[in-house]
């Protein structure tokens, strides 16, 4: 071919330099990353082509096409998780693929001497920016770009570092356009098509850290393995030794979780909070809520401090008694009622926060809305209302397609009200909390008045829900929605039973209802009951499901069912005697309670028979009121 190896290499390098100049003019981080891939391909192709040298121009652009094809393939994968490394982030993608992105990390600091920070070897440069505090005061903030999180940890010990929520890693991914559980560099809003598994060992008492049997649920298919399973999925939640038999880019240990949501729920949290899943897998609900609120502040360039010092102002005792009342509860008249409706405000507390613009920085800031309690400012939308509004809308949409993900959003919305009054909340304030309970009581009282005005009988009311009896419920709901500006849902029950305590007082949080054969039982079956008692009550509810009216309930006979379970208490399986208390299994033995994990060592038959008898008598008492 008339070319020597050195001259050929020089020709290839010239073509690479041309391509590099073109990419530099475009100022694209993605193309710059692509150029590095092209150089790798060129080196590989050169090393394999010494015997038959390819034209330098063709070689470079062949490498470009090759790199583009690989990048496009990776863009089809979902970003499952991300970890910081020196000089960049490492992405873990679906189908066990990985990708490294070269970048720096932003660290926001309030300092009078930014130049001295540059002496740290991993601090590249800084930019001066204008931010403001929650009360609107403008502050000078320096954004340092660092090569690794080690530099960030060094700085936060010595400087006033702010904007640490969302995390530095989350901020880095956000500005790179990389969002968890989306396709690489994509903003699509569809739930990722990934494989999700739950793998747990089973012992005689149920789920265990160790066991000879393994229950494996992959997406919606459940199987049991009587030997060590081999599981390969994108995301797995696993318990104890089961984690040793799972291959996954995201592995969540169930025993470390601090939230009530499943792996699918954690994916939803990661998805909405733009936070890598490993940062929230073991977090509380409050942390996820705070991250979502912090993103609103961050995008508005409002400084997010480590701690917000808030001191409650001095008040008279009578003032505190007036505001500190909590939610409104109407005690029901015990008994059974046919043809009733349960009317619920959908996400009542979060909806009131959004409607009335309740946030730490809006309460007592100006007098746009005056109440007997506090005033609210409407000049700018509050951080908390903005953070909650789209979550309310998302929950409503998800309920139509995926109850599990909707439940994950529901937990955040439930926590949103309590965190308003939490002393360590970044965006909370006790006065804001008081405003919400005040408006909730006012709203429920007015709803009860409307019901009575329209001839409905109010049987029960608790915080955000009413049980009413009568006609024209549709018109009642329409009027309440129009007057309050809040959305209502309702269910029609064939019958409902309100119960009493053993002290003969109404039990507002416990009732049993039949909705066309589907049983709704609140406060009846408790988590800390023995398994045999839970099974008894579940069978009682199955009997109740056949009753179409209160009269039918009264005709039911459950004595035979009780006798069956009394005999089972004497001759039952060991698992019947297990009692779960705070995720620990116990059994009541002759000498007292012992941990089931130590092995089965007998049971106190009288304890279980007496427990069943008490519950049976409670059920009979309930039926006698029909």
From Swiss-Prot:
CDD domains noted in UniProt: POLBc_B2 (cd05531)
Catalyses which reaction(s): DNA(n) + a 2'-deoxyribonucleoside 5'-triphosphate = DNA(n+1) + diphosphate
Pfam families according to UniProt: DNA_pol_B
Broad enzyme group: transferase
EC number: 2.7.7.7
Key word Signal present: no
Family statement drawn from the similarity comment of this UniProt entry: Belongs to the DNA polymerase type-B family.
Protein name according to UniProt: DNA polymerase 2
Taxonomic lineage of the native organism: Archaea, Thermoproteota, Thermoprotei, Sulfolobales, Sulfolobaceae
């Amino acid at each position: 071919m008339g070319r020597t190896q050195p001259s050929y290499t020089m020709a290839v390098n010239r073509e690479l330099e041309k391509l590099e100049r073109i990419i530099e003019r475009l100022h694209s981080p993605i193309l710059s990353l692509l150029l590095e891939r092209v150089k790798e391909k060129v080196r590989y192709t050169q090393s394999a082509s010494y015997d038959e040298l390819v034209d330098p121009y063709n070689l470079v652009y062949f490498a470009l096409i090759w790199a583009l094809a690989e990048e496009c393939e990776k863009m089809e994968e979902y970003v499952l998780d991300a970890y910081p490394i020196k000089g960049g982030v490492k992405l873990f993608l679906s189908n066990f693929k990985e990708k490294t992105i070269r970048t720096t990390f932003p660290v926001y600091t309030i300092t009078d001497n930014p130049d001295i920070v540059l002496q740290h070897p991993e601090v590249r440069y800084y930019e001066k920016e204008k931010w403001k505090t929650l009360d609107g005061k403008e502050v000078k903030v320096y954004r340092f770009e660092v090569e690794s999180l080690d530099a960030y940890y060094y700085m936060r010990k010595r400087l006033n570092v702010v904007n640490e929520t969302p995390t530095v890693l989350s901020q880095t991914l956000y500005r790179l356009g990389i969002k968890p559980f989306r396709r690489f560099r994509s903003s699509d809003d569809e739930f990722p098509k990934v494989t999700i598994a739950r793998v747990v060992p089973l012992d005689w008492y149920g789920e265990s850290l160790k066991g000879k049997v393994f229950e494996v649920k992959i997406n919606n298919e459940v199987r049991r393995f009587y030997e060590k399973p081999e599981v390969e999925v994108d995301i797995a939640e696993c318990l104890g030794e089961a984690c040793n038999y799972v291959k996954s880019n995201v592995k969540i240990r169930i025993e470390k979780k601090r939230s009530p949501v499943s792996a699918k729920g954690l994916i939803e949290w990661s998805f909405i909070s733009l936070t890598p899943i490993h940062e929230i897998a073991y977090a509380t609900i409050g942390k996820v809520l705070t991250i979502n609120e912090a993103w609103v502040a961050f995008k508005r360039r409002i400084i997010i401090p480590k701690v917000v010092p808030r001191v409650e102002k001095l008040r008279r005792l009578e003032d505190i008694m007036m505001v500190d009342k909590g939610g409104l509860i109407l005690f029901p008249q015990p008994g059974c009622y046919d043809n009733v409706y349960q009317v619920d405000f959908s996400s009542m507390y979060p909806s009131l926060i959004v409607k009335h613009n309740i946030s730490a920085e809006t309460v007592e800031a100006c007098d746009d809305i005056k109440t007997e309690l506090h005033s609210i400012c409407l000049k700018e939308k509050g951080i908390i209302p903005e953070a909650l509004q789209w979550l309310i809308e998302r929950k409503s949409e998800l309920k139509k397609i995926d109850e599990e993900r909707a439940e994950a959003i529901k937990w955040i919305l439930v926590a949103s009200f309590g965190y308003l009054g939490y002393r360590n909340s970044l965006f909370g304030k006790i006065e804001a909390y008081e405003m919400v309970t005040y408006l909730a009581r006012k709203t429920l009282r007015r709803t009860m008045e409307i019901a009575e005005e329209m001839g409905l009988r109010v049987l029960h009311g608790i915080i955000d829900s009413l049980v009413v009896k009568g006609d024209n419920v549709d018109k009642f709901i329409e009027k309440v929605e129009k007057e309050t500006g809040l959305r209502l849902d309702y269910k029609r029950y064939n019958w409902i039973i309100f119960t009493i305590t053993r002290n003969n007082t109404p039990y507002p949080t416990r009732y049993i209802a039949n909705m066309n054969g589907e049983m709704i039982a609140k406060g009846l079956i408790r988590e800390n009951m023995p398994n045999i008692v839970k099974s008894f009550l579940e069978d009682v509810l199955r009997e109740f499901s056949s009753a179409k009216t209160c009269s039918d309930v009264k005709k039911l006979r459950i004595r035979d069912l009780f006798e069956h379970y009394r005999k089972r208490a004497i001759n039952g399986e060991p698992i019947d005697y297990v009692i779960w208390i705070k995720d620990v299994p116990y059994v009541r033995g002759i000498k007292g309670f012992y941990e089931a994990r130590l092995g089965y060592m007998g049971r106190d038959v009288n304890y279980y028979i007496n427990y069943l008898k008490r519950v049976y008598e409670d059920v009979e008492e309930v039926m006698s009121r029909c």
